[in-house]
Regions:
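Conserved anion-binding
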Residues: 1-41, 45-49, 55-63, 68-74
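Charged helix-capping and loop-helix junction motifs
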Residues: 24-28, 77-86
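Generic hydrophobic/aromatic pocket-lining and core-packing "Φ" positions
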Residues: 31, 49, 85-86, 112
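Conserved, mostly hydrophobic/aromatic
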Residues: 34, 52, 88, 99, ...
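Structural motif
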Residues: 37, 91-92
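Conserved beta-strand positions in the central sheet of alpha/beta enzyme cores
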Residues: 43, 96-97
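Glycine-rich beta-strand-to-loop/alpha-helix junction loops that act as flexible
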Residues: 64-65, 98-101
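C-terminal helical cap(s) of enzyme catalytic domains, especially alpha/beta-barrels
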Residues: 89, 102-127
Length: 127
């Protein structure tokens, strides 16, 4: 895990990180460290996938949690850095993790089907 998707830039100082260290720099530093240590990939926000792939290579896997469909409001959501399924895939995510939008839906199977349709549409459009 690079940085939990529930952590925002403003929380870094409270967690003991230097004031001049940005969240994106911390994520990239941790991804670089993971890659140099022989890891096949990292868990990261969809916002950071493109930058990670840029420094670690296209084959370095990016698993993206905190994925929220545009229509899927999650009450009391603790996630700070979220993306839609379309956004995660367009940014280069290899795998996405969608939990609460399906689990908490009135009809989970329908919600899952809509997310799958969004993924398929995005994959088709990206070619």
């Amino acid at each position: 895990v690079t940085v939990l998707t529930s952590i925002s830039e403003s929380q870094l100082g409270a967690l003991g990180y230097k004031d001049n260290l940005s969240l994106s720099q911390l994520v990239l530093d941790r991804a670089r460290c993971a890659e140099k240590s022989g890891c096949a990939g990292v868990i990261c926000s969809g916002e950071e996938v493109a930058a990670i792939k840029n420094i670690c290579g296209a084959k370095f896997k990016a698993i993206v949690p905190g994925v929220r469909p545009a229509w899927g409001e999650v009450k009391a959501d603790d996630q700070s850095r979220i993306v839609t399924p379309k956004g995660a895939i367009a940014n280069g995510a290899d795998l996405i993790v969608v939990g609460r939008p399906i689990r908490d839906a009135k009809e989970p199977a329908v919600a899952a089907g809509e997310i799958v349709a969004e993924i398929e549409s995005t994959m088709t459009n990206l070619g």
